Structure formats: C-alpha cells, structure tokens
C-alpha cells in the first residue's frame, strides 16, 4: 500500500443492474470485500477520479447524465453530490487537469462537450461547449499541459484533435481537426506517456496499440508505430481491443482483448517509446475495462459477459501479471475504477 493511502476502494459500473458496486481491496492479498451498492436511474459506464482525489464522476449512459460523488476518506464511502443531465449518452467522462471542467464524449451522438464543475464538486447544468464530430466517439482526455484534448473515433478511423482553454472550460477544433492511423485500425481509448511526447491508442479492429508523436507546440498527433495485442496464431476477426493503461513510470503498457479474452502487456523503450510485446494474460469473458491501482501493484479486469472481476498482482520489474483472486460482481460490468482513500492527519491531542 502506498504510504499516502489508508485504503483502496474499487467501483464497478454494472450496466445491467443500473448500479455502482463499491468494494474495498485488501492491500496485501488483493481480495475484495463488497461495501455497498448504489442504485442509479440508468446504466452506468465510464468513471473518473478528480485530480485532487476527492470526487468521482460516473456517466449514467441511458439517462444522458453524469453522477458526481464526494469521496469520504474518513468513512471510506461515496457521498452523492447530484446527477446532472448533459443531454448526451456519454461513453467517456473525464476532468481537465485542474478538476474544474468535466469533459465528455458521446459514441451514439457523435458529439463532445464540456461542463463546469461547481465548488462542491457537482457538475453544473448547461454546457460550456458542445461540438459535433462523428459517430463512435469513444474517449476524451487532455494532455499534461491542459491545452490539447484528443477524442479517438472507431468508425471514421480517426483521432479528433481539440484545443482546450482551461480558463473558460471550452473546447475548440484544432487545425487540422483529425489525425488518421493506418486503414482499419479504429482507435478506441488512449494513454499519455508520463515523460515522452507520445500518446498510445488501442485499436479496436486493428487488434493493436499504436503510438503517436505529440507536437507539444501545436498539439498535432502523428502515428509512427503499431504492434499487435494478439498471439500470431489467433484469428483477429474474433477479437476487438477495448481498454489501455500505462504505468506511472512509463515502462509498461497494457491493453485488453475482447474475444481472445486477455490482457496484453508491452515493454516501453525509454528513448523511442516503441513497444515490445510481453505476451498475453488470460482474463474474464469480454474484458471491456480494466484499471491499474495508484501504486501500480494491482490490476483489476472486468469480464462484461462473465460478470466478474479478475485481480492480478503486477511485477514492477518485468511487467508480468499474476492472478490472485476472482470475484463475481454485478451484471454486465463495463467499467472498473480504483478509488484511493487517503490517510487523515491525526488530530493533535490537547
């Protein structure tokens, strides 16, 4: 356990249950204990923890809304702050680097937008920006400078590029508006290298991860390296990639395979950012989402069709994953999220 954290909570979006399942992870064994179940007015999806670690945002997809929660570090629970109608079914939600603006991307609507976040952490109704792109907008994240935002789209096989104004919370189109990888890859989710000017996207139909160079001056992306997530003898027509994560030290990347039902691992070259396959680790049926813990010791993958969680301990030296636990969960888990609980300062005795 990281010295800063008193506990690790894990939240699971169970779409079929229309509920958020809350667990606590044992930092030594990796075992999960369920703490609560939060019912929602629609199917939950994407989740995001604010930069200060005090808020959790959850897309309530079928209600076209976003739910906000205060993370109560003393009681190790979530306190509801409200559910805000954003007028779109958000496949992905995130905040900017300051935590003052909520960003979202709608797969079915082909639109992205931003909303202000109030001082209490709730999302304020009435958007700051709303920009049409194309169908199949899968994710949205801002870069480390909080200046550029990227939205991978599978159907048009493109990454849509935006400028972000942290003062106003508004998105605007960058020029050129799109960056295209090789034909048929279909970028889905993304992860920024913590040191190098590189962004990695997992490719839904390409069964691969593609690295893009990031021009820190104009925000433009350019694909330069692609590596498969599958073993050579597996039929790629029976697979699609879903999620991607990079370790905090930038040394390893993981991507999930739906069909092959595995987590693919890669070593990252410290100078070039190019990837070397480390193989695949079996996991649950249709791993739509997985997440690395804050110290990168634990990785949890959610099997959307097996309705379960698979908990792995990660070797920090070689990136290998060792399965420690299997946990049944709610029906149709589409997202799993670590929620760190901080240690509270002891009150001085008077």
Predicted regions and their residues:
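Hydrophobic beta-strand positions that form the internal "hydrophobic ladder"
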Residues: 8-10, 56, 102, 149, ...
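Blade-loop segments of beta-propeller domains
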Residues: 34-99
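Short loop/turn segments immediately following beta-strands, especially the blade-tip
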Residues: 23-30, 69-76, 115-123, 162-170, ...
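Blade-level signature of beta-propeller repeat domains, shared across WD40, Kelch, NHL, RCC1
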Residues: 304-308, 313, 322-350
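A short beta-strand motif characteristic of beta-propeller blades
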Residues: 33-39, 79-84, 125-131, 174-180, ...
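Short loop/turn segments immediately following the C-termini of beta-strands
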Residues: 13-15, 61, 107-108, 117, ...
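Beta-rich, blade/repeat-based domains predominating
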Residues: 41-52, 86-100, 130-148, 180-197, ...
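An edge-strand/N-cap motif at the start of beta-rich repeat modules
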Residues: 7-31
